[in-house]
Amino acid sequence: MKKIAILGSTGSIGTQTLDIVRLNKDLKVTVLTANKNINLIFTQILEFCPEFVCIFDIMEAELLKERLETAYREGQIEKIPEITTGVEGLIEAAAYENSDMVVTAVVGMIGIRPTIAAINAGKDIALANKETLVCAGHIIMKLAGEKGVNIYPVDSEHSAIFQCLQGRADNRIRRLLLTASGGPFLYTPIEELKDVTLERALKHPNWSMGAKVTIDSSTMVNKGLEVCEARWLFDTEPDKIEVVIQPQSIVHSAVEFEDGSVIAQMGVPDMKLPISYALTYPERRFVSDNYLDLFSLSKLDFIKPDLNKFKGLRLAFTAITEGGSLPTVFNAANEAAVALFIQKKIGYLDIVNIIEENLNRHIKIDYPDVDDIERIQREIIYGV
């Protein structure tokens, strides 16, 4: 029985992780956390009976306690789980003794310290939180190596590369080929991007994701963040990572070796596939009967990204190559700008302009620690 802690159980990755748990009787959920969606986590608690729960929002945590006490009196649950709140509660959840693996599906910088706590506690990590590696990859991967902890990628692209490298660790890699769908504006002329609305940006052609990730995909900032993740996950320099637009989202990524061989991972666009592989590695278990039908594919397209049109991707490569604290600046400025765009306070093109402005005025720290990373994040979030 593998015991799972899910940080961010009410989000897109969290709910799909629970779908995988439902399919596998040897997976047991012992920890659930959420920001403030107590309606959903209440139903999850009734179904999965975790031992430990964290609700980040203190007021919502009190409301959840009341509902659980009522449920206990009515016989809906046998035991009320321990409930904590805030950052410290999230860190406790990550290091909870009775879990073997931590799924980090929280969104934002809040995921860094809990991931560090989980690694220090010897937990394997199913990593879905981009910021952990984008901002603190130099810290996380070193610590994981020291503690003998496995980090399994949940992003479809990184999972694909991870799969392509199985049994080939000693082979020389020439390039990591990180695929991208190109988002909803792949074929939109650059001069029309200034008129993009929130509603249009939220319509991804292939994937069902949360709002922020969907917008990040439309600007290709998301792919820039994934390049940074790949740099740390696979210990590869940025100049050996190439982004390839694959509009059908069938080829999830590939690895080119020095002998010229290219190994790619293909499948239907379904996040449950990489989630399941991370939870049950090295096994491949049934996820759904939605299999890839090669005969139904008329073609597979591969397109070089336009770095003038998708300036966010170009800025990401600059930040990653220069390193230090610049990836944190890139991430924080994007997070702040996307939040403003979702609130309809800025235009679509302002997102990338805000990122560029913050990168240009930042004085780089070569080896930022977690305190540096969090300080930079706060300064940018409050300054935008």
Describe the residue ranges of each PLM region.
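Catalytic, metal-anchored helix/loop core of enzyme active sites in primary metabolism
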Residues: M1-V384
